[in-house]
Amino acid sequence: MHGQKNISERYQKFKEMEGTGKIVCVTGGAGYLASWLIMRLLERGYSVRTTVRSDPKFREDVSHLKALPEATEKLQIFEADLENPESFDDAINGCVGVFLVAQGMNFAEEYTLEKIIKTCVEGTLRILQSCLKSKTVKKVVYTSSADAAMMISNLKAVKEIDETIWSEVDNFISKPEQVIPGLPSYVVSKVLTERACLKFSEEHGLDVVTILPPLVVGPFITPHPPPSVSIALSIISGDVSMMLGVRLENAVHIDDVALAHIFVFECEKAKGRHICSSVDFPMHDLPKFISENYPEFNVPTDLLKDIEEQEPVHLSSDKLLSMGFQFKYDFAEIFGDAIRCAKEKGFL
């Protein structure tokens, strides 16, 4: 398995200071993907401004960001919140690029359509207005989700999902006051916000591209295991309840998806949506993998025997690959790196 040092060694060519002298903004910097993305941007020579939530109720630990090499010289941390989009102005002004990674919703909560539109859609659009107003931002990368393409009624009959497919959310958006449960509300927020971003791009001439990752797994620099890693590793404790509401059949390594964000930002050919998924696997392969490679956890190979086994739907990253991007990590590394990191940090 690859430790963080070995992961970094893979990218000597990557670290050619492409971003030297350039300033970019990453929203939601305390999170899993954003913190890893910040680490890679700093390595590439960029100066980074990142935002964390300003609400005292959601005070975020940023010690892992401050501990990054070159953070003292090249990382600035701003307080901002999607419910107050103007608070992003100072962080964005002077940047050449913005990575909209912050997630304005709690996966476990319920939301009305009105709340989703006000916080996620309108908040994001006002941030895009800030990008226009800055006169310096050349490109914006919005982190959507594969869920914005995979929630369709005939999914079992579909062999492949690509960027032309959008999740079907009409049933959830007929009434503004309608309460939408956790996972569907997340999907609705991603679909509506991504569509709004791309429409804004067309109408205002601001270059906006989107990334659609599935479950993101791998090592982490956050103080605690991220939700996606916790879901993937919950199988070790025998608690499969966390897995049942998640499509655990497509995944991508945290390093690959972070580098894909940088790739589409730097690639002039990148336009529109980009699915970023490296492996499709039957859910039942995960307990088998852990049982065979980590026998100390005593995970039964038939742990998911009560869940119907079926072939995964292929989540196609052909568009991203056709532009020259390459995935570096396979199934064993995606989950093996997560286990190794969790063990090293004392969570397993």
From Swiss-Prot:
Its EC number is 1.1.1.415. Pathway: Alkaloid biosynthesis. GO terms for biological process: alkaloid metabolic process. It comes from the Eukaryota. The keyword Transmembrane helix does not apply. One of its GO terms (molecular function) is oxidoreductase activity, acting on the CH-OH group of donors, NAD or NADP as acceptor. Keywords: Alkaloid metabolism, NAD, Oxidoreductase. It catalyses: narcotine hemiacetal + NAD(+) = noscapine + NADH + H(+). Pfam families: Epimerase. The keyword Repressor does not apply. PANTHER family: CINNAMOYL-COA REDUCTASE 16, NAD DEPENDENT EPIMERASE/DEHYDRATASE. Oxidoreductase that catalyzes the last step in the biosynthesis of the benzylisoquinoline alkaloid noscapine. Converts narcotine hemiacetal to noscapine. Belongs to the NAD(P)-dependent epimerase/dehydratase family. This is Noscapine synthase SDR1. It comes from Papaver somniferum (Opium poppy). The gene is SDR1.
